Structures are given as C-alpha cells and as structure tokens.
Amino acid sequence: MKVSVLITLAVLGVMFLLTSAEERGSDQMDSPAWLKSMERIFQSEERECRWLFGGCEKDSDCCEHLGCRRAKPSWCGWDFTVGK
C-alpha cells in the first residue's frame, strides 16, 4: 500500500514538472539550466595522473602516493607513503 502511494506521488510530480515546462515554452523544456549544469559534472576530464585502481604502465602514470602494481592487469595502488 505504501509503495503504491509513493509511486503515485512520484508520477504526479513528474507530470507536474512536464506540464509546467510546457507552459513556459518548448525552448526551456528542451534545455533547462539544471540539465546543462549536470552535463558539466559528467564530462570526462583529461587527467595528468591515474587515480587509485586506474590502469598504468609505469609508476609515473599514477598520482602522488600511488605506484603501478604490475599484476595483470596493471593498476595504481598505494605506495605506503603519506604527507605532502
């Protein structure tokens, strides 16, 4: 019973958002500002180094305090150092 009420409320919320977007105009519905801001979050970035568990070929591929573990497949692992 609780699940069906939650699903109904979710559907009504989505319908409300769609109808309010239609009232504002199709240009705002196609590219809302929040969608553009979310787009920036998920864009891939070129990084200078590989993070923990990232693929590598040599120690210099990995970020600071990480070293290339040459088990197959090679990956960046903590080199047991701390500090700046």
Curated annotation (Swiss-Prot):
Tell me yes or no: is Disulfide bond among this UniProt entry's keywords: yes
Q: Where is the signal peptide?
A: 1-21
* Tissue note: Expressed by the venom gland.
List the GO terms this entry assigns under cellular component, sorted alphabetically: extracellular region
Keywords assigned by UniProt, alphabetized: Amidation, Disulfide bond, Ion channel impairing toxin, Knottin, Secreted, Signal, Toxin
**Which residues are connected by disulfide bridges in this protein?**
C49-C63, C56-C68, C62-C76
Q: Which domain of life is it from?
A: Eukaryota
* MF term (GO), any: ion channel inhibitor activity
Q: Which residues carry this modification: Valine amide?
A: V82
Proregion positions: 22-47
Q: Where in the cell is it found?
A: Secreted
Alphabetized InterPro entries for the sequence? Huwentoxin-1 (IPR011696)
Pfam families the record matches: Toxin_12
Q: What is stated about domains?
A: The presence of a 'disulfide through disulfide knot' structurally defines this protein as a knottin.
The record describes the protein's role as:
Probable ion channel inhibitor.
* UniProt similarity note: Belongs to the neurotoxin 10 (Hwtx-1) family. 05 (F4a) subfamily.
Q: What is this protein called?
A: U21-theraphotoxin-Cg1a 3
Originating species = Chilobrachys guangxiensis
